[in-house]
Amino acid sequence: DGFEVLNVMERKHLIEDIPVIMISSEDSDVYVRRAYELGVSDYISRPFDAKVVYQRVFNTIKLYAKQRRLSTLIGDQIYEKEKNNRMMITILSHIVEFRNGESGMHVLHINRLTEKILECLVQKTDRYHLSYSDRYLITTASALHDIGKIGIDDKILNKPGKLTKDEFEIIKTHTLIGARMLEDMEVYKNEPLVKMAYQICRWHHERYDGKGYPDGLKGDDIPISAQVVALADVYDALVSDRVYKKAYSHEKAMEMILAGECGTFNPLLLECLVDIQDTLQE
């Protein structure tokens, strides 16, 4: 019957996009109320006037057309805002990379790696309850992971040789510098993107066994956003040329990460890295 059709449409989320007008000889309040609860746009009881029905159908279609145009307009505006956000984040992160003597590809690589790892993770488990919006925010905010390096002395940042213990302690402060920069943005600090970027900036050098920095967080006390970006950052650092080292091959980088030479990572994320490794060299 009509209610069964409405139930099917609701289960398949069709009722949100297709206007439904129900015509029935039933006119009890319970019957009509149930129809509206299931998502009908209008309810017409028999007997009816054909001209009135025509006008109500016409008005319903006209209303849905307006709603669709409005949704498209809002969608376009949101897209433009997100595009501008991404552009400004990319520009800012490239400034940091330029100062760090890098090519600018690191941010792009981190972005793509983060996206791929997250895609794999949500297929493996719902443990972290990551929505599409969450994954988008993490991927976008990943570009700002090293923004704190803008506060580190060039001589240390671009030193070709091994860092001294004191120099390494200074380098480690880039996590706190980046987090503080974002925290100091009073107007925007509660924006979801800024809050996500804060997590990543501060904790992308933490390790799953608690031996990372700056706070020595352990396991899932480390936000999953920072865990994912940490793994992406380590892999890309290994396979890229740096002022202090030559690039390792993909095979060697994977061997080092899986052997724990770069710290301990979430086993689920390591599984994801292995699963997507065929696409990594692209």
Region roles according to the model:
Residues 3, 86, 97-282:
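Metal-dependent catalytic cores of enzymes that make or break cyclic nucleotides
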